[in-house]
A protein has these predicted regions:
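Conserved N-terminal segment of class I S-adenosyl-L-methionine
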Residues: 2-133, 244-252
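S-adenosyl-L-methionine-dependent methyltransferase catalytic module, highlighting the catalytic core
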Residues: 30, 34-37, 41, 152-162, ...
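Generic "edge-of-domain/loop-turn" microfeature
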Residues: 120-123, 139, 180
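Activation segment
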Residues: 122, 133-136, 151-155
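Conserved hydrophobic/aromatic "anchor" residues
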Residues: 134, 139, 210-211
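A conserved beta-strand element that flanks and buttresses the S-adenosyl-L-methionine
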Residues: 143
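A short His-aromatic
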Residues: 146-150
Length: 255
């Protein structure tokens, strides 16, 4: 069933606990310093209320308590909208390249949970999603955020995700929106790990496999969560359309 986690995952887990402790100390201080800010938000991940922090060239992007960004807040809101406690308790989850805030959420509220990654050791199993080592109809929910832009044969990976889903199951497959049209590279660009720069047309690859694809837009949610990506300068990509405004979209694919 793929390579199981080594003991290195324990040490990584201890490091994360220390990291979360320090973040918990940071939030009250940041909130005090910026107490006069007119920009105050709610974080659906950790429950924090107050001003958000800047993240690189993104304004008011980061929660100072849990450290999560726009797409994490968006994911939590959409997941909670779809899965109430009763439905979650009957849902088997496969989490690929797991985010720690979602790992905790899934483990606490869902029927069963398996985390996976190609290289990381702090997961239950290591495997390549182009060949998922589970039988057909194994899961009700697959979550893989910002993964497919790294996968050489992404169409095969999408088929594998659909294969291990049960009928009616959902796959959450967000990718970065860098252009209107996806750019696939023949080789990985120098100094980059990605094999493609995904665009809004990328969701057509999901529609070719799944019966239904619902795209959640951050503008449909209350502004108090600050889900839109607000940039301070232009995005540098390999596309001529370098000033393309990045939408924080979340596609949910139904088998």
């Amino acid at each position: 069933m793929g390579k199981q986690r080594s003991d290195g995952g324990y040490n990584q887990g201890k490091f994360k606990q220390a990291e979360y402790f320090l973040k918990g100390l940071r939030a009250p201080l940041f909130k005090l310093i910026h107490r006069k800010s007119k920009y105050k938000y709610d974080c659906p991940v950790c429950g924090y209320h107050g001003p958000f922090m800047k993240k690189n060239n993104r304004l008011r992007a980061k929660c100072p308590k849990c450290g999560e960004l726009e797409r994490a807040r968006m994911a939590m809101l959409v997941i909670n909208e779809i899965y109430d406690n009763e439905k979650a308790a009957n849902t088997d989850v496969l989490h690929i390249s797991p985010e720690n805030f979602l790992r905790k959420h899934f483990k606490e509220k869902y029927k069963s949970y398996i985390s996976s990654d190609l290289y990381r050791e702090d997961v239950d199993h290591q495997f390549d999603i182009q060949s998922i080592p589970y039988p057909d109809n194994s899961f009700d929910l697959v979550f893989a955020s910002h993964v497919l832009e790294y996968v050489e044969n992404d169409k095969e990976a999408i088929k594998e995700i659909s294969r291990v889903l049960r009928p009616g199951g959902l796959a959450f497959l967000p990718v970065p929106m860098l252009h209107k049209k996806t750019i696939d590279f023949e080789e990985r660009p120098p100094n980059k790990r990605i094999i493609r720069e995904t665009g809004e047309d990328y969701f057509d690859r999901y529609r070719a496999v799944f019966s239904e694809v619902t795209v959640y837009n951050p503008r449909a949610f209350d502004q108090r969560y600050n889900l839109t990506i607000d940039m301070t300068n232009e995005i540098k990509t390999n596309n001529e359309d370098a000033s393309y405004q990045i939408p924080n979209l979340l596609p949910v694919c139904k088998l």
